[in-house]
Design a protein with these regions (language model features):
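Hydrophobic side chains in beta-strands
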Residues: 7, 19-21, 83
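Short, flexible N-terminal segments of the mature chain
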Residues: 13-41
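Solvent-exposed strand-loop boundary residues in beta-sheet-rich modules
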Residues: 9-11
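Acidic, low-complexity intrinsically disordered segments
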Residues: 34-87
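Amphipathic beta-strand/beta-sheet edge segments enriched in Tyr/Trp
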Residues: 3-5
């Protein structure tokens, strides 16, 4: 599974990271692990999954995390994650 993480500020892409998870774990575990790796790469705390994020991810394999999803203050408008390749 390959997931693309992007940080957006004022409609501009300010940072990007692609994480690839190749083990035989479940899809959910792969998504959570990729999110954790991306947050480490961006030096961020992990966002909180709200119901809207879960529903959007189920429908479109894509989710946006805004300031409402983070405990600490963030310096960007939102982080977007998108599944590029499934196993």
């Amino acid at each position: 599974m390959k997931i693309w993480f992007k940080l957006w500020t004022d409609t501009r892409l300010t940072a990007s990271e692609t994480i690839e998870i190749t083990d035989d774990d479940t899809r959910t575990h792969k998504v959570f692990r990729a999110l954790e790796e991306a947050c480490l790469a961006f030096d961020l705390g992990k966002p909180i999954w709200l119901d809207a994020n879960v529903n959007e991810f189920k429908r479109r394999s894509k989710a946006r995390f805004t300031k409402d999803n983070f405990v600490e203050e963030i310096e960007f408008d939102y982080m977007e994650m998108q599944v590029l390749e499934e196993d």
